[in-house]
Amino acid sequence: MDRGSKRRQVKPLADSLLDALDYDSSDDSDFKVGESSGSEGTGNGSDEEGSKESAAGSESDSDAAAASADEEGIDDLETKDLNQEDDEEEKVKESFSEETSSKETGGSSRSRKKGEKSSDMEPNGSATTEENSAEPKKWNLRRNRPMLDFTTMEELNEMDDYDSEDDNDWRPTQGKKKGKASSGKEKEGSGEEDDDDDDGGSDEEDNEDDNDDDDDDDDEGNDDESSSSDSEEEGKKPKKKAGKNTGAFDEEETNDSHSTSHGKGNEDSLLERPQTWSSQRMEHILICCVCLGDNSEDADEIIQCDNCGVTVHEGCYGVDGESDSIMSSASENSTEPWFCDACKNGVSPSCELCPSQDGIFKETDAGRWVHVVCALYVPGVAFGDIDKLRPVTLTEMNYSKYGAKECSLCEDTRFARTGVCISCDAGMCRSFFHVTCAQREGLLSEAAAEEDIADPFFAYCKQHADRFDRKWKRKNYLALQSYCKVSLQEREKQLTPEAQARITTRLQQYRAKAELSRNTRPQAWVPREKLPRPLTSSASAIRKLMRKAELMGISTDIFPVDTSDISASVDGRRKHKQPALTADFVNYYLERNMRMIQIQDNIVEQKNLKDKLESEQEKLHMEYDKLCESLEDLQNVNGQLRTEGQSIWSMMGGIVGQKLNVPAVLKAPKERKPSKKEGGSPGKSSSLPAMLYSCGICKKNQDQHLLLLCDTCKLHYHLGCLDPPLTRMPKKTKNSYWQCSECDQASSDEADIAMETLPDGTKRSRRQIKGPIKFIPQEMSPEPKKPQVRGTRTRGQKRKRMSICEEEKMEEPLPRERRQRQSTLQKKPKADDTRTECTTCKGPGDNENLVRCDECRLCYHFGCLDPPLKKSPKQTGYGWICQECDTSSSKEEEAQEVEEESVNEETAEQEIPD
């Protein structure tokens, strides 16, 4: 049977298209060569097969067509049409000769495929071969579909009787072809799941028919000749790149990824296809706003509202799976828009359980709105229909939970006590937070489906939540928020006006239906007794009040809300209660007024008592001053009598001729050094009589309990007179003491020298910045405001008289000049203070590892101290003495006490004989 007879049996274009679309790929194995005489081209590789057939019989096509026309009685018009078809096949052959030559150099796998293709056209081109006629062969109908005269997807869509929805097994491919290049496009979308049309790596085709290998060797030479002869004309034919199909992606991902070109141009175009598909796939990833999951399955699909763009699982929202669950963007076969309950009712709801305004809502039986996630996680919330999660019932929950706890995760503290807060499910944890706040931080969890738990929804705080689960949930939440912000704008741009009008019309129908059902449904049951609820627990009320304050010009920032959870005061009564129209708040308000009256009366009584005590203190101070004057007179008389007694005692010793022991009465009393115990520490009584000390700054002697002794200058200061003022007494330890700011300023030069040895000067510069600025102008001022009297002693002069002689005082009458000279004299020896040797171990050292005692002036290593230290025990504002000096001072105090006791005993013995 020659080629001309086959050409006469070519079907019309419409019939060929219907045959191609109704074709079932599962019947390939039963299709014989003899049954395929009705079609000439192929669907997937018709261009290639046609080119190879024309290459095998390019010289005798016209003769064979004429002979067949004479035998069958075809008229001249039919012969002319067949000759035109011959010319078209020759053009197709020339356009694909380069691809055929490239396949020849592809390896053994390519040669097998070409051999099979040559064996397919061998029964058509040479009918004289007995082996081919005697043995029928199978062929792949997907590779030999009728050749279509369409080059782009748009031309197919223009046909009235074509429906792209039903053609799930067909997709045009792209490639640089001319003329009938659409046959190459059909190859990718023809439902082909094997690798027959790939680069030549098909092993299944060889296994199906082993006899094809013998024919491959026989016909390989013919293919080589035809491809080599046509390769010269390949450069003259321009190529066109077919338009890329950017339709909805579906489950044909494997076909798209496995379909490869047979030329370099097709390879480049196919490399762009997976990238485009992956970018489209990433753009369509949806996240459920209830569980934050992104897994969408057929049984539980993620659907999206066509109005507000919110995304949710069907199971998470209680969609029944009927027509209302089909959404235009959720499935490629869906045509009905879907809307959430809030959009159906045409409201912008506010949740009653939390301050968040995002997410998806459900309506309560009382006409309020709550988040679905809030209704699932808040204890006490019930559903009328468990499967559909509606309506939500809030009456079963105790109303005392509203505003009872403060949310620890709220971004705006003004909404921290709105709604209902849940607690952390980790044992005795006392963390409370809103459900949506916990969802924002990724703290919500849900038990697995196989676990049988009464309440499968639980939440943990940041401390007890799993770090990895929290991380991916937090990312999904942020991705969901960013997607919701841009989804509406993108959808409006992508939708056509007709689709937008269809969605708007459908939404109006839903809203009319919802309005009708709202008016006809029975009224929900509510308890007879009205339950009070704090107004401040409603987030919507707080927003309206804030808006009112803004319109009135009142700033809400100047009224900070004190939400500290202090349940009771010192006397056991509640310190603060949220304002509400309840009996508890009324009782609290009345009790607070009574307490305020009592406190005010107490303040008046304390003021009167203070005035009375101050008047008594003034009288006592006057008596004290008189006693001090008499004490000075008695001390002078006592000194004179002591000197006379000593002279008489020495005279008596001279008369006796031997040295007599001077009695304790005639001995001059030693000046007792004030110890650290005299700094006002309670519970330590001294043998000396109590004295009233005056402040070194204000020169007043009131508030003796607030006077602090400086261990360097031995002056007392009020805590409030210091710079900066102190709020409590400084702590004095065993080996440290306290000094005032001016003494510390003078002794800080030693620390500055040590700081200079550090590698960086950060601490030194910081030390210089911290120095008090108010003392610098006093030292640098050239003229003093008021000359100081020589006998007086002020705060600025308390260290001048310690290291200055009388000659310097005569030479420098002005105190300001003495101050400058004294500071110079004091700094010189401290600048030369270099510590080189440890007193304990006699080892070398420097200022970085040695510390000097402020009394004995000896140096010690930090590690040689008892106990050893890692850093200097000298702190800023405090001095330091070694352990030996501290022990010796305590021994001196004990010896002095013993001596005083002995003096008292001798005095008592001398008074007895009298």
Swiss-Prot record:
Coiled-coil positions:
596-644
| Binding-site positions, Zn(2+) 7 | 710, 713, 740, 743
Identify a single GO molecular function assigned to this protein: histone binding
Q: Could you say what the effect of mutating residue 314 to R is?
A: Loss of binding to histone H3
Residues binding Zn(2+) 1, per UniProt: 288, 291, 313, 316
Query: What does the entry list as the binding residues for Zn(2+) 3?
Result: 351, 354, 371, 374
| Impact upon substituting residue 306 to A | Loss of binding to histone H3
Where does it localize? Nucleus
Q: Biased composition, Low complexity: where in the chain?
A: 53-68
Zinc fingers, PHD-type, are found at 285-346, 405-465, 692-746, 835-888
Please tell me whether the keyword DNA repair is annotated for this protein.
Answer: no
Q: Where is this region: Disordered?
A: 19-276, 777-838, 887-914
- Binding residue positions for Zn(2+) 8: 838, 841, 861, 864
Membrane-spanning ranges: none
Q: Where does Zn(2+) 5 bind?
A: 424, 429, 461, 464
Binding positions for Zn(2+) 2 per the UniProt entry: 305, 308, 340, 343
Q: Where is the composition biased (Acidic residues)?
A: 155-168, 191-233, 894-914
Annotated residues that bind Zn(2+) 6 are located at 695, 698, 718, 721
Q: Quote the biased-composition stretches of kind Basic residues, using this chain's numbering.
A: 792-802
Q: How does it assemble?
A: Interacts with histone H3.
Q: What is known of its domains?
A: The N-terminal region, including the PHD-type 1 and 2 zinc fingers and the C2HC pre-PHD-type zinc finger, is required for binding to histone H3.
Q: What is the purpose of this protein? A: Histone-binding protein. Binds preferentially to unmodified histone H3 but can also bind to a lesser extent to histone H3 trimethylated at 'Lys-9' (H3K9me3) as well as to histone H3 monomethylated at 'Lys-27' (H3K27ac) and trimethylated at 'Lys-27' (H3K27me3). Represses PDGFRA expression, thus playing a role in regulation of mesenchymal cell proliferation.
Protein name per Swiss-Prot or TrEMBL: PHD finger protein 14
Species of the source: Danio rerio
